[in-house]
Amino acid sequence: MDHSDVEAEPTTIYPGHAILYQHNSSLPVMYRSLFVFLLIAVSACSMDNPTEDQVVAFPQGEIVDMSYAYNDQTVYWPTAPGFDKNTDFEGFTPAGFWYTAYTVTTAEHGGTHLDAPIHFSEGKHAADEIPLERLMGPAVVVDVGEQAAADRDHLISIDDIMAHEHEHGAIAAGSILLFRTGFGQYWPDREAYMGTAERGQDAVSLLHFPGIHPEAAQWLVDNRDINAVGIDTPSIDYGQSTMFESHQILFGDNIPAFENVANLDRLPETGATVIALPMKIEGGSGGPLRMVGILPTQ
C-alpha cells in the first residue's frame, strides 16, 4: 500500500508529549511499533513533568543484526559450559497439530552477550538493574582493524580513541562506544578468533585477541560520558589479561559492556543507532544479548 500522500501524525504518550509517527517509514510495521514502545518506556522514565509539546524522532534505516545465533558452534570462554538445546517435543501431537518445545541451557557469558557491571564490581548494576536508556543510543565505532591485524594482542589506546575523535569529533554523551578490531571475520573458528580452541582453565593463558587498554578505560571514565562499550572479540580486556582491569574500571562506573558483537563491519564510524537488550536475569552478571544497529539513511 502506498502511503506517500499521508502526512505524519503525532502519537500521544500523555498530555503534552507526542511521538512523530511517519506512515511512509521504510521500516516494517513491527519495527516501527518497537521503536514507539521503546521511546515510550524511556520517556516515561526520564520526563516526569513535561510542560510543552515535544516531538521525538525515532531512527529510520536498514536494520543490522549484531548478535550471533546460539548453536553448537557458539564461542564461550574456555572455562564456561557451552550451549545445549534439548528437544522436549517436536512433531504432530495426538490431536493432529504441530508442536515444538525445547529446553536450552547456556552460561551467561557466551555468544553475543552482556557483561553487567556487577560481573567485576561489587554493588554495581546486575543484568536486571541496568537502566534501559543505557542499552540504547547513538553508535560510535572506533576502528582499530589495522592495529589488530598487525598485533592480535593489541591494546586499544587513548591515542586510538583520539585519532577517531580527530577525524569524527568528540564522542558525544550517551553514546554506545564500539571497538571494531576486525576479529568478527574469524567467528566461529575458536582458534582464529580466540587464539586457541582448547577448553578448560589451562586454555585461558593461551588466549590472544585485542582489548581495551586500562589507561583508555580510565580515560573514558574521566573524560567521556558513554552509555556502554562493545567489542567484536570475546572480552573488552585483551586475551592475555589476568586482572581484567578494563572490566574493573568501566564497571566501577556502572558502564556495561557488550562482547562478541556481530557485523560491526556494517556500521559506519558515526551516525548509526544501537539497541542492545539482554535477557533479564535477576541478579545476573550478564546474559544473552539481542543487539541491533539502525544504519543512517542516505
Show which residues each predicted segment covers.
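Bimodal feature
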Residues: 8-9, 61
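Short, positively charged and aromatic/hydrophobic N-terminal segments
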Residues: 19-21, 25-26
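Sec-dependent signal peptide recognition
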Residues: 31-37
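Hydrophobic h-region of N-terminal signal peptides that target proteins for export
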Residues: 39-46
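Active-/binding-site microenvironments in catalytic and ligand-binding cores
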Residues: 46-298
